[in-house]
From Swiss-Prot:
GO MF term list: FAD binding; UDP-N-acetylmuramate dehydrogenase activity
Naturally occurring in which organism (per UniProt): Staphylococcus epidermidis (strain ATCC 35984 / DSM 28319 / BCRC 17069 / CCUG 31568 / BM 3577 / RP62A)
Cofactor(s) the protein needs: FAD
Name of the featured protein: UDP-N-acetylenolpyruvoylglucosamine reductase
Top-level taxon of the source organism: Bacteria
Length: 306
């Protein structure tokens, strides 16, 4: 199908106001980088997501899912096919000791709702700048907690558009990994089972984690969050720091002087700058310590053609 055929097909199953053509993706990423999407869709209902995925599958159109854009780098060549934004699926509901949240809900907001209902278990997420869908996708975690600890189930859609309800065990949550990644599923919503707590203790823990995050992380610049996974027996930031790479810069992107595990966009940096800096850091750390640094951040899209 050519782009006009795809557009007509999408307009036959979706409201026109949720379809954007040749949409710049830098508007939707924390790094403020990225080329254009052929089609950028922002459905507001689960049924619309299913319809999009089914249409794409039947017509062999690639689909890329995008949440909050906080732990992703999109190359300047953009993304072919469909980019499906889940941010409008942002409902948050509570029932006794459970919270059900849409894929596009900010996990920070869900953590705050848990606190407001005096439920403990999601304090670790109070500073994670991602969506629920992204958090399940990568089993997000911080300061000793992770999604795996409190999720009950996730409602997902497979590549054919079929609806799946996956339990914690079926999600196969591991360190920054899940069956959602492995099988290219899309999360529609997730349910969390929490425990009744004490408001002052919950708030104190969230305040402590927020203070630690603000004191250690370079929140004053655009960034993609933590760049590398934790290698066994090491800390990525410490290895980078001991390699004297803090402040090292390629183009407009540099290794943060505040936290070596972060790379910040200090001067109109590009995805190409980010990728080159990542490869340089990996090379130096490998040479100096014989340790492979694997990326936590996802790098997607086409390389620029010029």
């Amino acid at each position: 199908m050519n782009k006009n055929d795809i557009l007509r097909g999408l307009e036959s199953i979706l409201p026109k106001d949720i379809i954007k053509v040749d949409e710049p993706l830098k508007r939707y990423t924390y790094t403020e980088t990225g080329g254009e999407a052929d089609f950028y869709l922002s459905p507001t209902k689960n049924e619309e997501v299913q319809a999009i995925v089914k249409f794409a599958h039947e017509n062999s159109i690639p689909v890329t899912y995008l949440g909050n854009g906080s732990n992703i780098i999109i190359r300047e060549g953009g993304i072919r096919g469909i980019v499906l934004s889940l941010l409008s699926l942002n409902h948050i509901e509570t029932s006794d000791d459970a919270i059900i949240a849409g894929s596009g809900a900010a996990i920070i907001d869900v953590s705050n709702v848990a606190r407001d209902h005096v439920l403990t278990g999601l304090e670790f997420a109070c500073g994670i700048p991602g969506s629920i869908g992204g958090a399940v996708f990568m089993n997000a975690g911080a300061y000793g907690g992770e999604v795996k600890d409190c999720i009950d189930y996730a409602l997902c859609v497979n590549e054919k558009g079929d609806l799946l309800k996956l339990t914690t065990a079926e999600l196969e949550l591991d360190y920054r990994n899940s069956v959602v990644q492995q099988k290219h599923l899309v999360v529609l919503e997730a349910a969390f089972t929490l425990e009744p707590g004490k408001l002052d203790e919950i708030q104190a823990k969230m305040d402590d984690l927020t203070e630690r995050r603000e004191s250690k992380q370079p929140l004053e610049f655009p960034s993609c969050g933590s760049v590398f996974q934790r290698p066994p027996g090491h800390f990525a930031g410490k290895l980078i720091q001991d390699s004297n790479l803090q402040g090292y810069r390629i183009g407009g992107v540099e290794v943060s002087t505040k936290h070596a595990g972060f790379m910040v966009n200090v001067d109109n940096g590009t995805a190409t700058d980010y990728e080159a800096l990542i490869h340089h850091v990996q090379k130096i750390v490998k040479e100096k310590f014989d340790v492979e640094l694997n990326t936590e951040v996802r790098i997607i899209g086409d390389h620029p053609t010029d």
